[in-house]
């Protein structure tokens, strides 16, 4: 138990995840991961003088999620921590829609109550599952990075994941050792959800028939991708600034000599600015790239993007 406190405390310091006097909103479902997170942050709170709050999102998928929400409210009351509950008033048809709804509502609660950090209970096992989920649905290197330690939202609030170096197995043992109460969500067992299929079918198959240490291999690969993608993003931003200070002719000559990887990133950024993220897929980026190559003497890159928006 002491080892896990120490390990997570060390990760918070090494990755500069949280600061003294932070106002932290803990996203909690009632499962072992979020209950563990609440316990750990409450124990560390005196050292950091954090101001803690708890938020729970009820997707209304089943009876167990409602029971979990009720129990989380009781825990918050017992700990004298501010509690916020959000219940959906319309049916969330899939995991992606549920995730979008959940993050938006939590951000709204955090912003309106002046929390500067949202903490989630995503762990090392979630990171691996998210890697496969993103990879199998089709994504870029940036998209396949999986879960990051921290991410800034447009509101200025940071999402922080202090359990990313801790496995679900470690959290399970932690919960058992100190007898924490649990209210499992039965939706986590349903194979209707793709993430559950990855957890219950794909990963056990890979461990058995390909590599028993596949979790560690993927976790290391996710870290490498993150670091390399961070570097590429910085390079792209520098080139983007240089590119659009010049005239149309300078832009064409400059782009002509860019590596394809950077060219794709430049196009992706322009699509996001001029159109929307919904247009940012491999097919659209490649169509614009090839069209620009054929017509670079005639049109600027921005004009090519406008053609595809009509």
Curated annotation (Swiss-Prot):
Subcellular location(s) of the protein:
Plastid, Chloroplast
User: Which Pfam families does the UniProt entry name for this protein?
Assistant: ATP_bind_3 (PF01171)
Q: Does the keyword Nucleotide-binding apply?
A: yes
**Which spans are transmembrane here?**
none
One Gene Ontology biological process: tRNA modification
Q: Write out the GO MF terms.
A: ATP binding; tRNA(Ile)-lysidine synthase activity
Q: Which GO terms describe its cellular component?
A: chloroplast
Q: Is the keyword Protease in the record?
A: no
Supply the alphabetized keyword list.
Answer: ATP-binding, Chloroplast, Ligase, Nucleotide-binding, Plastid, tRNA processing
What is this enzyme's catalytic activity, as reactions? Answer: cytidine(34) in tRNA(Ile2) + L-lysine + ATP = lysidine(34) in tRNA(Ile2) + AMP + diphosphate + H(+)
Gene3D superfamilies xrefs: 1.20.59.20, HUPs
Q: Which residues form a coiled coil?
A: none
Q: What is its EC number?
A: 6.3.4.19
Q: Where does ATP bind?
A: 29-34
Q: Where mainly found?
A: plastid
Free-text note on domains in this protein's UniProt record? The N-terminal region contains the highly conserved SGGXDS motif, predicted to be a P-loop motif involved in ATP binding.
Report the function annotation for this chain.
Ligates lysine onto the cytidine present at position 34 of the AUA codon-specific tRNA(Ile) that contains the anticodon CAU, in an ATP-dependent manner. Cytidine is converted to lysidine, thus changing the amino acid specificity of the tRNA from methionine to isoleucine.
Which family does this protein fall into?
Belongs to the tRNA(Ile)-lysidine synthase family.
Recorded protein name is tRNA(Ile)-lysidine synthase, chloroplastic
Gene encoding the protein: tilS
């Amino acid at each position: 138990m002491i080892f896990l406190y120490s390990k997570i405390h060390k990760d918070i310091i090494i990755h500069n995840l949280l600061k003294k006097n932070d106002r932290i909103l803990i996203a909690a479902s009632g499962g072992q991961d979020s209950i563990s997170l609440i316990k750990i942050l409450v124990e560390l709170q005196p050292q950091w003088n954090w101001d803690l709050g708890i938020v729970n999102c009820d997707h209304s998928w089943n009876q167990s999620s409602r029971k979990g929400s009720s129990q989380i409210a009781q825990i918050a009351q017992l700990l004298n921590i501010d509690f916020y509950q959000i219940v959906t008033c319309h049916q969330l048809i899939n995991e992606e829609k549920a995730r979008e709804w959940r993050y938006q509502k939590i951000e709204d609660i955090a912003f309106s109550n002046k929390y500067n950090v949202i903490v989630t209970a995503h762990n090392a096992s979630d990171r691996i599952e998210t890697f496969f989920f993103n990879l199998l649905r089709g994504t870029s290197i940036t998209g396949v990075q999986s879960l990051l330690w921290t991410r800034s939202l447009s509101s200025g609030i940071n999402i922080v994941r202090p359990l990313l170096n801790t496995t679900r197995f470690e959290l399970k043992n932690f919960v058992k050792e100190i007898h924490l109460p649990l209210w499992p969500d039965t939706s986590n067992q349903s194979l209707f959800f793709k993430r559950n299929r990855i957890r219950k079918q794909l990963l056990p198959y890979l461990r058995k028939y390909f590599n028993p240490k596949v979790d560690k291999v993927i976790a290391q690969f996710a870290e490498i991708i993150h670091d390399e993608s961070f570097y590429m993003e910085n390079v792209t931003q520098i080139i983007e600034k240089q590119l659009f200070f010049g005239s149309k002719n300078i832009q064409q000559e400059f782009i002509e000599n860019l590596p394809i990887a950077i060219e794709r990133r430049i196009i992706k950024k322009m699509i996001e600015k001029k159109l929307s993220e919904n247009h940012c897929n491999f097919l659209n980026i490649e169509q614009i790239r090839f069209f620009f190559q054929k017509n670079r003497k005639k049109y600027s890159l921005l004009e090519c993007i406008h053609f595809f928006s009509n």
